[in-house]
Amino acid sequence: MSENSTVKKNVRVRYAPSPTGFLHIGNAQSALFNYLFARHYHGTMVLRIEDTDVKRNVPHGEDSQIDNLHWLGIDWDEGPDKPNPKYAPYHQTERQDLYHRYITQLLDQGLAYKDYATEDELTTMRDQQRAAGEAPHYDGRWYGRSVADQQAAEARGLKPSIRLHLPANHEYAWDDIIKGHVAFNSDNMGGDFIIEKSNGMPTYNFAVVIDDYLMDITDVLRGDDHIANTPKQIAVYEALGLKHPNFGHITLIYNPKTRKKLSKRDKETLQFISQYKNQGYLSEAIFNFIAFLGWSPEGEDELFSREELIERYDPARMSKSPAYFDQSKLDWINAAYIKRLDLDDMTDRVLELVDEGQTDVARQVKALQLPDLRTLTSQVCKIYQTEIHQLSEIMDKVLFYVTILQEPLDYDQLRQFDRTATLAVLTAFRKHVQALPVDVATPDFKKMIQTVSQETGVTGRNLYFPLNVAFTGDHSAPQIDEVLRLFANSTIIELLTKAIAHV
């Protein structure tokens, strides 16, 4: 690590998404590590919107990014919603005059030049280079061309792009916060590169330099797919006579099956934070999980609050190796956080998912319009809190129990047990339920099960498994006496009658 990267005074970092869609887990990883870095060093986190690629921007893409960052618990100190007059605006499309000012400076100094090459000419150039066994690169054909040549191109209706001229055999190097020393030679960077497109819009590698400089960004943490961009950005800094910030390149997230970078084509893995939210993953669990995708603390503990992660964060423990997305680990972490929830909090979170109606099961539960939905949801949460990995499973259970008389239960499981004992248990239990006074709102089902056991002489699995099948369709159901509280007595009697008919 460089000496500069260990000096952490007045730290300013930025997360700079493009409003091109939902918050991807890879982008969330970058946002999270910038957040931890800023908070650990008591610095400033900036949210900047890189929206110059207008064709790729989607309606409400920015709002979606911001909403999901808030849901994760990632906040910032400056941004479109928290402008600092010294650094605003925070949308690149609103900063065009700033970029053009520096473009003009480079043109005036002869460090950049206009390129009128057409796309067809550039394609032919690259094809010829490949045919000659060369790596495609810009050959500098418009560097040093006369004003007359430029005027002739203008007369043909051509609009120039602007390229930064790279000195030959020049090293662009930095001491990466994560990767260590990294160096590129200018001869292997594809030639002079475009810093302003022919439509007048700056390229990413130019605009980001101007923004980071003017916003006093001290440390740039981003995915290691940006490593090839960094020497180009350093070239811009050097051309302008500016000091570049510290760079740190975070390992990307990989699919453990293919051993390749996680791709949006990997349908087996949820890609977007909103999908995890809608499935009932807790924000604190997702935060905890992502923090381990590229970093690890000292010790063996794996469950940490945001505050603990901020305290323990150390960039020296960032990994250089790929981070593999372990779905089973995420499910384990989420289950652990669900177990910690207060019952009312858990109920609130499930009902919020129902109200938002972003999944089929949420919409189905919402459509039931149950007047006692909160009570029912709370009861189901109490029964299954230690059994589930996602809050969506609670919605599944609520829907199942409300519609259980229409559900095709697996009565074949009843044949695994002694037929005589099963009939005795189910029949005796039905008799006791039928005998309940109408005004008994909450029967003591645990005591009733004990009474049936005493009357029939049936105990253990031969007692409980048939009851589990009758009321859940699964012989391994938890807390059957609590499950029974979900039903009206008439429903219990009907379920017992159906089960008896299948013995």
From Swiss-Prot:
- Record-linked PROSITE patterns: AA_TRNA_LIGASE_I (PS00178)
Q: Which GO terms describe its biological process?
A: glutamyl-tRNA aminoacylation
Instruction: One GO cellular component term, please give it.
Output: cytosol
Q: Quote the function comment for this protein.
A: Catalyzes the attachment of glutamate to tRNA(Glu) in a two-step reaction: glutamate is first activated by ATP to form Glu-AMP and then transferred to the acceptor end of tRNA(Glu).
Cellular compartment(s): Cytoplasm
Q: What is its EC number?
A: 6.1.1.17
Species of the source: Levilactobacillus brevis (strain ATCC 367 / BCRC 12310 / CIP 105137 / JCM 1170 / LMG 11437 / NCIMB 947 / NCTC 947) (Lactobacillus brevis)
Q: Name one GO molecular function term.
A: ATP binding
Where, by residue number, does ATP bind? 264
Output this protein's name: Glutamate--tRNA ligase 1
